[in-house]
């Protein structure tokens, strides 16, 4: 019995060597599944597992069995596919029911050799040397006969009935071995496509609609014959393409001179980590900073209050938005409009006298002005110098207009001195602002570098933004740059 099984296995291995690899992977669908494949455009009766998966995807798309909103859900109730699956719906994220149906309705090429007529017909069509069932039996008998001749003296001759029993068992073992071999190959074919539950439309259209390409920032890579699209947006990384070469070289040299301690590798790491943050800051710098109404950086502390109408205005405004009064201490070269100045120390405008009131025959004193916090110290010194309670001249105010004129003239002189001091300080600040950028030395200083609660206005907006994107520190105090804003000087 052992000799017969051994010879059968040898004949099986010889026949397997004569079968082409393409025919080993081919399967024959059963009639219900074959109708579905033909409805999807398939031709013939022998297919590979990949072709069966392709035509199944085409069938689902043609019949529109999938949900339009959730396309991974396939509703096959009342359809031939639903009858084969034995269920009303399934999800392509879990294609195990579909694979179970294919294992039941696909017959491998080696299993079809159990029918001798079908095997001979397939051999004639494909012009392949595929042995029939009778040839397998004959080769097994010849090998067993030669084996028996060598052991003729030791083993007695078996009866005819026992020979038939041995042949029948031998055929069953042969078919079982072939069926197990091809079933394992069929399982391998399914495992090849079962990659994390890929959807049917991806499997069905992969070969025809997707080709590997590399174009710009979009790449299509292949992994085990399965396409994986990897899309990367590099528009934020290519911002320097829109700038001229001279600006890149000039600013690059200035950045290295400003911060010599930072290496190029550290700059690269910091720039990679802050790509998203720079993109957000660019939106604020380019669009929102151009409008005073939408400026998110202007707080209520920076606004100035008009002394005429008490309205708070933006620090970049020269005149009050409501009453059009000029802001005090704007610039020293501005002509002073005495009729509409919004100032805290007006000393030359007399008030209208109230009609019908008995007043002394002397010049009226000027009403106390609105004192801002920064002018409180100056006014306090002036009040100490001319305290009406301690001054002897206060007793003569009602009787002598000359003494009152003297006091008012001295007060005006002190106010003029304080105004001249503030004007000189403003002139120095204006001269510093009129200097060009400390990096490019071409553009004006309109880029304010913010770090914490302080900032430095030493560069133009273009160079300041380049420093921020490069991850460099402030060229003055070496602090980390948190924000760059554009300053408008009207």
Swiss-Prot record:
Top-rank taxon: Eukaryota
Kindly give the InterPro entries that the UniProt entry links to this protein.
MDM2_MDM4_MUL1 (IPR051652), MDM4 (IPR015458), p53_neg-reg_MDM_2/4 (IPR016495), SWIB_MDM2_dom_sf (IPR036885), SWIB_MDM2_domain (IPR003121), Znf_RanBP2 (IPR001876), Znf_RanBP2_sf (IPR036443), Znf_RING (IPR001841)
Q: In which tissues is it expressed?
A: Expressed in all tissues tested with high levels in thymus.
Its PTM note reads: Phosphorylated. Phosphorylation at Ser-367 promotes interaction with YWHAG and subsequent ubiquitination and degradation. Phosphorylation at Ser-342 also induces ubiquitination and degradation but to a lower extent. Ubiquitinated and degraded by MDM2. Deubiquitination by USP2 on the other hand stabilizes the MDM4 protein.
Its BP terms in the Gene Ontology are: atrial septum development; atrioventricular valve morphogenesis; cellular response to hypoxia; DNA damage response, signal transduction by p53 class mediator; endocardial cushion morphogenesis; heart valve development; negative regulation of apoptotic process; negative regulation of cell population proliferation
| Nuclear localization signal, short sequence motif: residues | 442-445
GO cellular component, as recorded: nucleoplasm; nucleus; transcription repressor complex
GO molecular-function terms, A-Z: enzyme binding; ubiquitin-protein transferase activity; zinc ion binding
| Intracellular or extracellular location(s) | Nucleus
Q: Where is this region: Region II?
A: 246-332
Protein purpose: Along with MDM2, contributes to TP53 regulation. Inhibits p53/TP53- and TP73/p73-mediated cell cycle arrest and apoptosis by binding its transcriptional activation domain. Inhibits degradation of MDM2. Can reverse MDM2-targeted degradation of TP53 while maintaining suppression of TP53 transactivation and apoptotic functions.
Q: Give the Gene3D superfamilies listed for this entry.
A: SWIB/MDM2 domain, Zinc/RING finger domain, C3HC4 (zinc finger), Zn-finger domain of Sec23/24
Q: Where is the composition biased (Polar residues)?
A: 130-143
Annotated stretches, region: Disordered: 129-160
Please tell me where this protein is predominantly located. nucleus
Q: Where is the SWIB/MDM2 domain?
A: 25-108
Which CDD domains is this protein grouped with?
Answer: MDM4, mRING-HC-C2H2C4_MDM4
Residues found modified as Phosphoserine: 342, 367
Sorted alphabetically, which Pfam families does this protein's record hold? zf-C3HC4_3 (PF13920), Zn_ribbon_RanBP (PF00641)
Q: Which organism is it from?
A: Homo sapiens
Quaternary state and interactors:
Interacts with MDM2. Interacts with TP53, TP73 and USP2. Found in a trimeric complex with USP2, MDM2 and MDM4. Interacts (phosphorylated) with YWHAG; negatively regulates MDM4 activity toward TP53.
Disulfide linkages recorded for this protein, renumbered to the chain, are: none
UniProt xrefs under PANTHER family: MITOCHONDRIAL UBIQUITIN LIGASE ACTIVATOR OF NFKB 1, PROTEIN MDM4
The protein depicted here goes by the name Protein Mdm4
What does the entry note on its domains? Answer: Region I is sufficient for binding TP53 and inhibiting its G1 arrest and apoptosis functions. It also binds TP73. Region II contains most of a central acidic region and a putative C4-type zinc finger. The RING finger domain which coordinates two molecules of zinc mediates the heterooligomerization with MDM2.
């Amino acid at each position: 019995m052992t000799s017969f099984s051994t010879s059968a296995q040898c004949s099986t291995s010889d026949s397997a060597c004569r079968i082409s690899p393409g025919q080993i992977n081919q399967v024959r669908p059963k009639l219900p599944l074959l109708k579905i494949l033909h409805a999807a455009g398939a031709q013939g009766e022998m297919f590979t597992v990949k072709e069966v998966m392709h035509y199944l995807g085409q069938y689902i798309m043609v019949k529109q069995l999938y949900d339009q909103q959730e396309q991974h859900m396939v509703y096959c109730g009342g359809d031939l596919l639903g009858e084969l699956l034995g269920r009303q719906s399934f999800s392509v994220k879990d294609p195990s029911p579909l694979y179970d149906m294919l294992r039941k309705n696909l017959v491998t090429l080696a299993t079809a050799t159990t029918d001798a007529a079908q095997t001979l017909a397939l051999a004639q069509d494909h012009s392949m040397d595929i042995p029939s069932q009778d040839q397998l039996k004959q080769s097994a008998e010849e090998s067993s006969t030669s084996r028996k001749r060598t052991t003729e003296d030791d083993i007695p001759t078996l009866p005819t009935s026992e020979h038939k029993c041995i042949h029948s068992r031998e055929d069953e073992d042969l078919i079982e071995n072939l069926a197990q071999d091809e079933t394992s190959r069929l399982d391998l074919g399914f495992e090849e496509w079962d990659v994390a539950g890929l959807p049917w439309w991806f499997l069905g259209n992969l070969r025809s609609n997707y080709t590997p390409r590399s174009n710009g920032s979009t790449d299509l890579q292949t992994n085990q014959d399965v396409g994986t699209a990897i899309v990367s947006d590099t528009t934020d990384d290519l911002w320097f393409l829109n700038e001229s070469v001279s600006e890149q070289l000039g600013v690059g040299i200035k950045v290295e001179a400003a911060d010599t301690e930072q290496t190029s590798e550290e700059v690269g790491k910091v720039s990679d980590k802050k790509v998203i943050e720079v993109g957000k800051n660019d939106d604020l710098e380019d669009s929102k900073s151009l409008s005073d109404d939408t400026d998110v950086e202007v707080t209520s502390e920076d606004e100035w209050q008009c002394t005429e109408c008490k309205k708070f205005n933006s620090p970049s405004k020269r005149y009050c938005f409501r009453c059009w009064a000029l802001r005090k201490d704007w610039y020293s070269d501005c002509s002073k409009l005495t009729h509409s100045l919004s100032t805290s120390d007006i000393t030359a405008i007399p008030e209208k006298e109230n009609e019908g009131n008995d007043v002394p025959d002397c010049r009226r004193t000027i009403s106390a002005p609105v004192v801002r916090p920064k002018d409180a110290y100056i006014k306090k010194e002036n009040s100490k110098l001319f305290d009406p309670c301690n001054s002897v001249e206060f007793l003569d105010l009602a009787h002598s207009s000359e003494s009152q004129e003297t006091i008012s003239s001295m007060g005006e002189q002190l106010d003029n001195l304080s105004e001249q001091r503030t004007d000189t300080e403003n002139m120095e600040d204006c001269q510093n602002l009129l200097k060009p950028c400390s990096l490019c030395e071409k553009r004006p200083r309109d880029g304010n570098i913010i770090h914490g609660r302080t900032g430095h206005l030493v560069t133009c907006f273009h160079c300041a933004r380049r420093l921020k994107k490069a991850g460099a520190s402030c060229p003055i105090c070496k602090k980390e740059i948190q924000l760059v804003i554009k300053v408008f000087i009207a």
